[in-house]
């Protein structure tokens, strides 16, 4: 697809790739509800457009790369928080996951939109489902996937209406997800 990200291998290229992402993040943080363009990234970063197109063939590919970067950060936090959990109760795992996700979203409000793209939803939903299946092998993968999509969409709903995840929305997201899991 036209949003394919070409990941660099060489050190110099990796630095350029990172610079594009840093600039894109800077633009998103300074302009709320802004649509990112390669032209703006080129202007602000001082990089030439052809060198940006080398890694990012489209505007969407920059957003996808930012999504991936923040999804991986969130997933690492989730895994760290689940490391010390020694019980296999799937509901307890989801409580932790939902809390960590809400905290991450609230601490990164300016760029949280990138966690709610279709690309991010697919990545998070797959990775979280796999993590839950690893911790609780008795749960059905499809059930984990649906539970994950449920809490992500309810957190997004809260984020959209309040520009953060309030304790009330967090509580309701957990209740909905846990209610589904208990059936």
Q: What is each residue range found by the language model?
A:
Residues 107, 148-167, 178-183:
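Amphipathic C-terminal alpha-helical segment
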Residues 96, 116-148, 168-178:
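Amphipathic alpha-helical packing segments from all-alpha helical-bundle domains
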Residues 65, 79-106:
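Hydrophobic alpha-helical connector segments
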Residues 1-15:
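N-terminal intrinsically disordered/low-complexity leader segments
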Residues 28, 61-73, 77, 115:
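Alpha-helical DNA-contacting segments of helix-turn-helix folds
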Residues 95-123, 157:
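Amphipathic alpha-helical segments used for helix-helix packing
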Residues 13-24, 41, 66-70, 74:
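Generic hydrophobic, amphipathic alpha-helix propensity
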Residues 19, 27-61, 65:
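Helix-turn-helix
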């Amino acid at each position: 697809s036209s949003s394919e990200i070409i990941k660099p291998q060489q050190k110099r290229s990796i630095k350029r790739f990172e610079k594009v992402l840093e600039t894109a993040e800077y633009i998103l943080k300074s302009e709320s509800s802004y649509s990112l363009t390669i032209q703006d990234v080129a202007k602000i970063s001082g990089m030439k457009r052809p060198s940006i197109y080398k890694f990012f063939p489209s505007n969407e590919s920059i957003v996808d790369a930012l999504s991936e970067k923040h999804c991986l950060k969130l997933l690492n936090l989730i895994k760290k928080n689940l490391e010390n959990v020694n019980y296999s109760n799937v509901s307890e795992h989801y409580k932790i996951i939902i809390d960590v996700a809400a905290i991450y979203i609230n601490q990164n409000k300016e760029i949280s939109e990138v966690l709610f793209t279709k690309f991010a939803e697919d990545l998070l939903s797959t990775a979280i489902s796999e993590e839950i299946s690893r911790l609780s092998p008795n749960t059905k993968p499809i059930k984990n996937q649906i539970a994950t999509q449920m809490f992500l969409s309810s957190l997004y709903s809260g984020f959209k209406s309040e520009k953060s995840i309030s304790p009330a929305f967090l509580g309701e997201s957990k209740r909905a997800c846990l209610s589904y899991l208990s059936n």
